[in-house]
Amino acid sequence: MKYEIIHINRFDYETPVDQSMNSIRLEPKTDECQRLLVYHTEITPHSLTSHYTDIWGNTVESFYIAEPHTHLEVKTTSVVSIQRSPFVDQLTYSKAMQDIFSSQLFRDQYLPFLSQTNYTYLEPHQVTNVKNEIGDIQNPVQFAKSLMNYLYAHFTYDSNSTNVNTTAREAIELKSGVCQDIAHTMIGVLRAQGIPARYVSGYLYVGEDSALVGDAASHAWVEFMAPGIGWISLDPTNNVEALENHIRVGVGRDYGDVSPVQGVYRGGNQNLDVSVSVTLLDS
């Protein structure tokens, strides 16, 4: 599958601002299943960008605007090619996987993705309630799949019930939210079970005939570490393995590590308008 993504963030300010310092994480990844073919950034007012790779392996572009301005527009255009086949249902929990999963080396290696954050932390009784529902499952792959099924069945997708600061422990009580909330909740339970899990930000191609649900502007899903296999992507918002409709941009411990646009400025209030289009170029 080949896609073109056009992502526009426009900030309008009540009064002229200056000394605007910003960073963006909008460049899709290149990995074993996804290839970035084209990527460029347009910034208005014009500004040059510098690039670096953060601790999680995400590409970050930073820029500085010194002149007074009443609006800021960041437009990125990307073309990506994805070839990703389903395989999670084919995995068996071998003796080798069990040995790796129970080893201290495995725990130490993935400690950042076993440690809870404010976004992902769940109260012990909340974790217990979920585990009682899905059963005592020792196989981490099967546990992750069953957890995804549970969250899909019990959460209602509602963009009005939560906001960008909502935590997993709040969302699980509401049993509603958006992809960010459902992903944080799944990550929180996985980590409580001793399964390394990370947050994935990106784009979702829903198409005209797709049953997939999500906001193309900022879809999120989960990756968990299968011992001896690698990271496996699951989308609990849609109860599917994340495959060719899912375009990976950033990974981290939670949303805070992959926020698409971050910045500071001196001036008045702002209004943000986001526009995203994901177009299928070749299937």
Language-model-derived ranges and their functions:
Residues 105-177, 185, 193, 253-255, ...:
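Secondary-structure boundary elements
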Residues 3-4, 23-27, 92-94, 148-154, ...:
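Short acidic/polar alpha-helix capping motifs at helix-coil junctions
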Residues 149, 181-270:
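Hydrophobic/aromatic-rich core segments of domains that either
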Residues 1-86, 93, 98:
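Intrinsically disordered, low-complexity N-terminal segments that are enriched in acidic
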Residues 25-27, 42-44, 77, 223, ...:
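Residues in well-ordered beta-strands of folded domains
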Residues 48, 153, 163, 168, ...:
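Glycine-rich, flexible loop/turn motifs
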Residues 3, 18, 35, 68-70, ...:
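A short, structural micro-pattern
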Residues 94-111, 240-241:
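Flexible glycine-rich active-site/ligand-binding loops centered on an Asp-His dyad
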